[in-house]
């Protein structure tokens, strides 16, 4: 618009420094990534019950463990693109919704085949979280804190797995 000064967002971010917005964003990131980390590790604790309930041999559950990791691979690429195209917030909402629906449904799986596909699809949602949490924290941070905030945000995954 004519007559109004041009605003450079990157300059404003760098001048402002760390704010309560960044702390709140990091707290939200903590909970989102913590839940994803928990889900990645939770199947290991459910395995003995599933083996007994479905009369499986221990090795038969291996593909279910791998399914979520394969889903994470595809989810990272898919939701990374969604975040670039439609925004990080939309990508985080979509990936968490996908993850939540299929993780909930996995609780009602009646056989190995169902569990495999539900864990694969939940993995797609989980995979979408990490690149977008890293990006949203880095993009909103002052230049000198970008790497630090991004690493802190993604560092919560193992904490979730340890719970």
Positions of PLM-derived features:
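Transmembrane-helix signature of 12-pass secondary carriers
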Residues: 1-163
């Amino acid at each position: 618009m004519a007559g109004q000064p041009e605003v450079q967002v990157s300059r404003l971010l760098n001048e402002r420094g760390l704010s309560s917005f960044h702390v709140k964003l990091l707290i939200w990131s903590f909970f989102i990534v913590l839940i994803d980390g928990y889900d990645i590790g939770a199947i290991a604790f459910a395995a003995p019950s599933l083996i007994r309930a479905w009369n499986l041999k221990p090795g038969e559950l291996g593909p279910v463990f791998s399914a979520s990791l394969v889903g994470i691979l595809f989810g990272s690429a898919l939701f990374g693109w969604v975040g670039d195209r439609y925004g990080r917030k939309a990508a985080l909402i979509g990936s968490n919704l996908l993850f939540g629906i299929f993780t909930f449904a996995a609780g009602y799986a009646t056989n190995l085949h169902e569990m495999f596909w539900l864990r694969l699809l939940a993995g797609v949602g989980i995979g979408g979280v990490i690149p977008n949490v890293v990006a949203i924290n880095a993009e909103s941070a002052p230049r000198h804190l970008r790497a630090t905030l991004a690493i802190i945000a993604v560092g919560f995954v193992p904490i979730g797995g340890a719970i």
